Regions:
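Short, small-residue-biased leader/transition segments that mark boundaries at the very start
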Residues: 2-3
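Membrane-interfacial helix-loop-helix junctions in multi-pass membrane proteins
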Residues: 7, 65-80, 84-112, 149
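Transmembrane helix segments
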Residues: 12, 43-77, 84
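Alpha-helical transmembrane segments of multi-pass membrane transporters/translocases
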Residues: 15, 97-128
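A structural motif at transmembrane helix-loop-helix junctions in multipass membrane proteins
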Residues: 18, 22-54, 69
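Residue-level hotspots within the lipid-embedded alpha helices of multi-pass solute transporters
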Residues: 21-26, 61, 80, 111-116
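Junction motif at the cytosolic side of a transmembrane helix
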Residues: 34, 38, 113-149
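Membrane-interfacial segments
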Residues: 39, 43, 70-71, 94, ...
């Protein structure tokens, strides 16, 4: 039965969980840093953070689906989406028997690459966003900030 799967908590599982936690923390911190550079007050920040919360909650619900069938092709591809990787990989690693190293290391690689790219984009937004204090940007304007030199 799908609901009677055993959770395997061994040393490698723990190490991978720490790695995905740290990568997810840095990734979402970068997203919130970009958000902080674009807003001037807490009220504006609450308005802009809704999409970030939706991605996180969506990943949370997807995690339960993946926990039922962690070795499917769909679970593999979902685990490569950086917004969902930290949560989905917790489920895949804990429930899969054995841990599939190729998918796990590929997820780590994609997460590292997307985090580096995100930090680069956030640094551009932050540089311009700090200078534009008092002006409420749109999403389209934030994309223009990325292209500024």
């Amino acid at each position: 039965d799908v609901y009677k799967r055993q959770i395997h908590f061994t040393a490698p599982v723990f190490v991978f969980m720490v790695v995905f936690f740290l990568l997810g923390f840095v990734f979402y911190s970068g997203l919130y840093a970009a958000l902080g550079a674009m807003v001037n007050s807490e009220d504006e920040g609450q308005q802009f953070q809704t999409p970030l919360i939706v991605f996180f909650i969506l990943g949370y619900f997807i995690m339960f689906t993946v926990a039922r069938n962690p070795d499917t092709v769909r679970a593999f591809w979902i685990s490569l989406v950086p917004f969902f990787t930290p949560l989905v990989m917790f489920a895949r690693i804990a429930v899969s028997d054995p841990i599939l190293p190729s998918g796990t290391f590929l997820s780590i690689f994609v997460m590292i690459l997307s985090t580096i790219l995100l930090i680069w984009v956030v640094s551009k937004i932050y540089r311009v966003g700090i200078l534009m204090y008092g002006k409420k940007p749109s999403f389209k304007e934030a994309l223009k900030w990325i292209r500024y030199k």
